[in-house]
Amino acid sequence: MKKLLATACALLFISGSLILVGALPARAADPVPVILTERPHMGLDGTFYDDQLATLLLPSRRLGQLVFTPSRINRVWYIDAALLDQVAAMVDGYSVRVAGKSGELVSGTGMNVAMSWLSALKQVTRMNPVLALPYGAPATHWLEQLAPNELHFYEANSQLKVGFYVGKYVDVTPSFPGEKTPRIPGETQDTYNFIRKNLKGYLKVVDIQDTNPYRLGIAQLTNPALNYDDSIRLSRAFLNDFQVFNKRLRIVVGKYTITSEREKIPMTIVNGFNKDVTVSVVVSPLNGKVTVSPIRDVTIPAQSKLIVPIKLHIIA
C-alpha cells in the first residue's frame, strides 16, 4: 500500500472507524534566557561608588541592549532585584562618591536613562516568564550551609521586588544558566558574617527601613560573578558603611575618678535613628571589688541622647 504524505492532516483507520487527525504543530523553540544581574555600584547607605550604571543602561550598552532592543524571540528573564533597586535609586536622584576624597559627593547623571530603562523593562517582560533570583544573585549553595534563613529572606524579598518592578507575579529561582562557581575570599566571608550577626541586635528595635538595605545588601558579597579584587574592594566598602550605621546607636565612653564607697557616674547613650529605641544595658566591672546595681531597660528618644546614672559600690 502506498503511503501518502499529508501536509494538513492524516487519515487513520482504526477498527473500521475513520479518525481525522490535525497536523502536529512544530515544537516551539526553547526560550532564550536573559540574565539581568550586575555587580553592586551602590553602597549600603544608598550612595553610589561610581556612575557606571548611567552608561550601562544606555540603549547601546549591555544592560540597555537587553531591555531596549525589540525581539520576537521567546525569552525567559532571570532578574536580580538588587540591580532594579539600584536603578530605582537613580530615578529618585542619587549621589556618587568622589574617588579619593572621603565624604565628598557629586550628583549622578543617570536619572533619565534609569527611568526609561525601568519603564522599558516592564513593557518588554510583559509577555515573557520572569524568574526572580535571590537578592544580590548570591552563592546559594554556600548560603544554604551557612545562613539558610537569610537565603529564604533574600528569595522572598527579591520575588516581591521583581514582581513590583515588572508589574506582575513572578516565580523565584535559586540560580540562572551559566552561573559561575563561587570562590568567596576569606576576608569577604568574614565581613558577611560580621555584618549579618551584628545586625541581629537591631532587627527588633529599629525600623526595617533602616536595617533592610544592610541585611539585603550584604547578600551581594557572595555573588559568584565577583572576581577576587572586586570582592575584597566591595567587602571593605560595605564594612565601612556598616560601621557608620553601627555608630547611630552607641555609648559615649568617659573617664571618671571614684573617690567614695558609693558613686554615681553618668553614661551617655546616643540614638541616631528616627525611632525611640529601647535597649538593655549590662555593665560588667573588671575590678572584683566593684559592684554595679542592675539597670532597667532604657528607652532613648529618636535622634537624641540620654544620660543614664550608673550606681557603683566599692567593697573595701
Regions found by a protein language model. Give the residues of each.
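N-terminal membrane-targeting/anchoring modules of bacterial envelope and secretion proteins
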Residues: K2-K264, T268-G272, V277-A316
